[in-house]
Amino acid sequence: PMELFYNWDDKDLTNALEELGIATLYSKTGKLVSTTPYIEEVLKCDLFVDFSGEMWGYHADLVGKNRFLVGLIKDRVAQLLKKPTVMLAGSQGRFPDPNIKKFAKEVFENFSLVANREAETGKLLIEDGFDVSNLKNFACPAFLFKPASDDEIAPILKKENIDVNKNNKVGFILCGFNMTEAPY
């Protein structure tokens, strides 16, 4: 659920920092000293996918206070919980706050793969001092997205022999310039 990732309230940063502390201890000891609903969801995942697009950078704060920092922390929590993490359809940057930029580099470099949707961003990341060895450029998949009802999805799952009760689960963070209110 989106509210476990970012809920547009004053607790978002506090909750994320608590989760970062829990995940950091886990990465050093292998023991989970506490948990949260977000951590429980991450632990269920076989693969953690960040689908932030332009929201992976300063644009994120246009939709909510500390939105980018909270997103970075949530990504890092998944990494520290030893989940393979992938950024899909990214368009990262810019990073005007030097402290957040330093943390963004750490998170970026710990993605298993960054599947970028255009090459220009890679050049900007290199200018910003990012290690882009995990970056691959692809075409933007946005044109493939269209809404579908459960009735439309069921035959696809059957045809592809996908049993939602037996197959591995993948968690997505879906986010973008699709908000219902300005400034979008």
What are these regions (language model features)?
Residues 1-184:
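Active-site anion-handling motifs in enzyme catalytic cores
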